[in-house]
Amino acid sequence: MTNDDPGGHHLSGDLLAAWTTGLAWDEHRSWAMAGHWSTAATIDGVTATLAPISAHHGRRADQLRTFWPQRRGGTDGAASPAGPPTPDDGPLLDLANALDEAQRSLGPPGETTWTGTTSMAALRLTAQLILPRFLTCYKQLLKLANAPSDASIRRICELALTDTTADFVTATAKLAALGENPGPSQIDDIQHAGMGQNPTHRPK
């Protein structure tokens, strides 16, 4: 029961709970944020791009919730105490921090006056900050799901990678269409996403 993970980690029950709970919550947060951004944006192309991305986040959140373990008090994994941190938790922490940063950048719903600049910032945060970190998380979870019993979670990860990669490429292409041509680093990220490799994380 090994793969290319040098640490030999695999999905114990607690690790599966931590990952599916964390990812489901982050997908839910992203569904809400992207949904708000899509309606608040003042550029039609941004609205048209972010609305389906929001829907994809919501669908993945629902799929991940099916893996939450039954615990005393119900199935709400978020109510269960977190286990000790492991080396595999890094991508989840990076993703949570990215969502916090995005929320701070654009402000809570109803407290920001949206302009074209704000709309472009929302699309930029989606393409260059949020989606690349989801890709990293799903690739890490796919690596951990290396036991025969993990087939269902591997399938969820494969579907999520396909959706998220497509959203990443679409959002980046829309940035270019709206006049923000990707530099070499963004082109490199697009190519890596298409090849199934980890997109690089650039300074924001």
List the model feature ranges, each with a label.
Residues M1-K204:
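Iron-associated oxidoreductase/ferritin-like identity signal
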